[in-house]
Amino acid sequence: MKMVEIKKILVPTDFSKGSERAYPVAQEVAETFGSAIDFIHIIPTLKYFNESIKKLGVPLDMEKDLYPKIIDESERSIERAMDQYLRKENKGDHFVKIERKPSDAIVEFAKKNNYDLILMGTRGADETKMLRGSVTERVIRKSRIPVFSVGDRFDLNTVDNVVLTTDSSELSLAAFPLAAALADTFDAHLTMFHVIELYGSASEDIPRDPGKGENVSIYEAIIERINDYLAEKEMDNVHIQRTGVTFEDEIVITDGEQSRSIPFYTRIEKGVSAHYEIENYASEEADILVMATHGHSGFAHLILGSTAEKVAQYVKIPVITVRPSDEEFDD
């Protein structure tokens, strides 16, 4: 079984400078994975404005007079952007829709049309002090499809360290296949980052071996859980190969009679809060940060999701969030 396939990419845009930063990255990803790129623009429903016009008796019909002009201009803007940034072989379709909530419309459209990745700018026209604006943040929270959010200029050719966060739970390992695929594709190494929170964390249930110490006990347990996860997902061509050096291993990928390896490092830190430690480490060491998020209620799901959302709001580097499947939540 292949780790990841990215055949269809959806790029939401509001034509702001923030959303434009995603266009060249989408092209780079599409070239690498052989993907088709579709663009979508959501025109927010001007419900209250329409009602006010009617009350004032202004002779203007939103459906007949205003929306058609906005749609026509949006169509032209999308076509110009796709012509400027995308290669012909990666250029897909474009869509303009009128919806009440852009974030909900993006998530639903991506799910309905079986996209493999949503790739969007961290901030659009809704500029805020947070690095990921409200629309992007809501898409990250709600999407069942991986979301790749990019801010400043980003060159995939410079990727050296892909960082995957884990709280040691199986839910957090849902992001492992994509993180490993990215490291493999960009000839980078993968670093798994785990935080032992001072006031309790998911790794508390891991037995400590007094002869090895806390960090080594957690490290060995997580490596074992990853191999179990890969076996459960029938990814028989991928496994973690121990090197004999603590915290330094290899991800071995077998393709027929050929095999290749990805340098795989584990970093364990103690801290008051996971999101604070992740932000600090990722800002200094990571080129791409990959995290699992939630989408369900419940204490464990809330902790996993809120950590991902907090980190995604404030780190400057590209962030990819992956939501575990419903089956994984139910296990």
Where does each model-flagged region fall?
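Glycine-rich phosphate/pyrophosphate-binding loop and the adjoining helix
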Residues: 191, 195-247, 255, 260-261
